[in-house]
Curated annotation (Swiss-Prot):
Annotated function: Cell wall formation. Catalyzes the transfer of a GlcNAc subunit on undecaprenyl-pyrophosphoryl-MurNAc-pentapeptide (lipid intermediate I) to form undecaprenyl-pyrophosphoryl-MurNAc-(pentapeptide)GlcNAc (lipid intermediate II).
Name the UniProt record assigns to this protein: UDP-N-acetylglucosamine--N-acetylmuramyl-(pentapeptide) pyrophosphoryl-undecaprenol N-acetylglucosamine transferase
Any one GO molecular function term: undecaprenyldiphospho-muramoylpentapeptide beta-N-acetylglucosaminyltransferase activity
Spans through the membrane: none
Family of this protein: Belongs to the glycosyltransferase 28 family. MurG subfamily.
Organism encoding this protein: Borrelia turicatae (strain 91E135)
Entry GO terms, CC: plasma membrane
One of the protein's GO biological processes: lipid glycosylation
Amino acid sequence: MKAKKRIFFTGGGTGGHVFPGIAIISKLRELDTNIEFFWLGQKDSMEDKIIKEHAYIKFIAIPSGKLRRYFSLQNFTDFFKVIFGIIKSFFIIKKYKPQIIYATGGFVSSPPIIAASLLKVKSITHEMDLDPGLATKINSKFANKIHISFKESTKYFKNKNVLYTGSPIRKEFSNPNPNIIKNLTQDTKKPIISILGGSLGAEILNKLTLNIKNKIDAYFIHQCGRNLDATRENNYLRSQFFNAEEMASIIKFSNIIISRAGSGAIKEFANAGACVIFIPFVKGSRGDQIRNAKLLEEQNACFKIDEENLSESKIINIIKEILENKEKSNILRNNIKEFHNQDSSNLIANLLLKEFGKINAG
């Protein structure tokens, strides 16, 4: 009887740090039925909620503090949370003996990567954004390999074992069902404008939607997060969340997407060849979304409006320009596809299987 392969994934805080890991796990399950999957994350967190929807992944809670570049009294207590997270990860790894640990980003991913280094367990960290966050900068000092989602990120990891893999997307996005968006929009013949606030929702996008939805002749799909109730009105559908199949259909078949500029969302839009207006998140952010969107804007792959320049009239004018200029829309759709031009889930899954082979051979 073959010994079970075992892999730990770790990452969280937002869906963008969780869904890529799930995409890799789904592909690994297709390729090899002899693998056990674990996820290390914080209790009652975004990753806890998402992972518990997947019975084949065992979730293990670990403590971890937020890593900050600025002074805060919380830095003192969070430092000890990180230490406790490393200690707990150390003993969890010793107990379950995974052959590989794969980090998908977020502060919670650093303690397991550091513990893996102490125990000489193979580890890989994946930077989803254009430039590395503090967690990835820390992880890169301890991990054996670094995977990146943007080719342009290589310059941030000099003298490191870096591989451009792209960002994995969930399998539901590979073949979206057009009937889903027809049902969501009651088979409207109007242009479809989808405003997506991400896994945490976005207050500024919620306000924007309510202000413009009756000023443009279109059907609006609005993903609002927990701060608003779901509703359906004439030419307007609002939901706190959409499942993966619904989101895949929305992204593929909407005429326009208005969204934040998280790396996971960008890759899903690129895979679909979506026409996107990005409004990057600023408050509480390290500026990664601004740089993500700026890169695409420079390649004529999107429209970008910074929050400080956002106005009702500006967004309405851009929407009208896209709807009235099909050539411009097609240029944006073709150019954004260049940011997701490989099957990243399959690539990474096969790389991990090779790592398992090397470990077992050794």
